[in-house]
Amino acid sequence: MKLRNGSPEDAGMSSGRIRHVERLVQRWADTQVSQAFVTVIARKGIIVSHQAAGTASPGPESSPLKPDTLFPLASITKPITATAAMILVEQGLLSLSFPVSYYIPEFVGEGKHQVLVHQLMTHTSGMRNNEIGEHSRQKEALVDIPPADVNQHPMIHKRLFLGYDAPLWKPPGTEMSYCGYGVELLGEIVRRVSGQTLESFCRDHIFTPLEMNDTYFTVPEALYSRVIRRPEDAPGGRWYHTPEAMSSPSAAGGAYSTALDIAKFGQMFLNKGMYGNERILGAPAVAEMTRNHIPHISSTYGAQFFKEASYGYCWPINHNKKDSGDLFSPKALVCGGAGGVNITIDPHYDTVQVIFSVESKSNDGHNVWFPCMNLFNNAGIAAIEA
């Protein structure tokens, strides 16, 4: 099954309620809740809404936003990287139960030999961003960075090298702490095992078969004008539109894409690894990626503490952390990215919902994008009739 356009009734949804969702999004754009919104709602493989509202850049002279505008995916990049790793697992080239150090011998330090590849994808490796960042800053002042491999980006190589010998925060497998560096390690494993750059591997095995023709780890210069511009004081406003950001193939957050392309990626998971006649993953691999691997393990996320986390392989599972909507099933997969992007896939309702926007804050400092994401997702699910 491929995504196709159709009426809400074809998908068992209400036309009136879908129109309500579209009016809601348009009102948010018109009242400058956020500068820009591109949204997709699909059910049973049928796109019932694909909307663009707002402007392509801040300011009164900006042109209207187009549905094919490129947005930085930020952390939505992570499940793409995890999918690449699972493809290597299926090819018999990678084992998730092997130590990270088996594939990256430079990954050293007390207890580091106990960190397993699958723990990079559930954020239970025992690493934490704070410790890695502080260690890297101190190390950079003391050492010379060795040259990167021919097929390795210098910026990614530098980040990896500086963190290879960072100390663990906790023993592996004892607590979840969201760690982008762990997914950078996963991307490096994909590079070393496949012999390709992460982007090249994803292009061959994910983007091309999924017809994700507008998805890039390195945005071509000819397409820079299609990338959303955001106010400088918005989250990522001074970074996401720079040539450095658009050419930095970070496994944890470097991809750029359109809302429609990411909806295709989500539909592949609902199709148990298929898209049209193309198989990207086997059904067992999809099942492994989308089940909770860390029951009974607690989680810290910023200032929040959760007694029990719920995480697949780079896919957060709805379970008891309902911050992207109130009506999804407990099996829903919810992945957001810094700056204002979100995809939610609900296998129970057979839905894919994507909202790409520009994260902003109100005058009193409150984030006004997160409520929009929540409300959009609620209104979309509420359109289901049968």
Predicted ranges, named:
Residues 343-344, 350-360:
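Short, well-ordered beta-strand elements
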Residues 14, 78, 258:
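Short, conserved phosphate/pyrophosphate- and ester-handling motifs at nucleotide-, phospho-/glycolipid
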Residues 95-110:
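Short, glycine/proline-biased beta-turn/loop segments that scaffold the active-site neighborhood
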Residues 6-73, 95, 239-241, 381:
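Short, conserved catalytic-motif segment at the N-terminal edge
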